[in-house]
Amino acid sequence: MDLEIFTLRERPDLRPLVFASELQSVWSEFMRHSAAAELYFATPMFDGYLDYAFAGVADGKVVARAFSVPFAFNIAGRAELPDGGWDQVIRWAHDDRMTGRAANSLSALEISLLPEARGGGNSLALLDAMKACAKTKGFAEVFAPVRPNQKHLQPRLPMRDYVETLGPDGLPIDSWLGTHLRAGGKIIKIAPYSMTIVGSLADWSRWTGMSFDRSGELLVAGALSPVMVSREQDCAV
């Protein structure tokens, strides 16, 4: 499949298609309710990121999307990548925009492909589009708070143990981590509370169709770790 890649600045007509239900459904419903995601995708904010948002088109159909965000790194208070990962880099980018601080780095946020577009190097093509964008903007580095795409199969395994489990090829057993390493990336650190999703028990029931009727750990399909439930506080994380 030959994939043409455009920024949403170049092709604003593709914006509604990038958010059409077919691509939205690539992610579990609960994944759409991170406070950081709501900040990034809010219309006034997202309008400022169109140079860093990509649509992949094949045979006239949008079959892939990729989002990234520019931010300032190696400045006061940001000498290291954040433990908050995905969430924190969005907040950093938001703070930079609000204060007029110039960005010097790019962070990938998401690459999603419909099943028909997977394989054949399309995810690498989208990564390359991000790297080319960063180079054009004069950014020094490209980072990615990678969400391992098979970790949900072992939700109780600590993330560090999962990441350090290697296959016969010497790469992590997780195919998405392996893709980034083969593309020239390196693992810098674990972000222990990246993409934290907080909601009331009613919220989580609505997102998952499950009953949250007891406190403790609950395994939720698609989650990378057990969801921590408090009936007493009417909250789950």
Tell what function each PLM region has.
Residues 3, 139, 185-186:
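Short aromatic/hydrophobic-glycine micro-motifs
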Residues 23, 110-112:
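Short, histidine-centered active-site or binding-site loop motifs used for metal coordination
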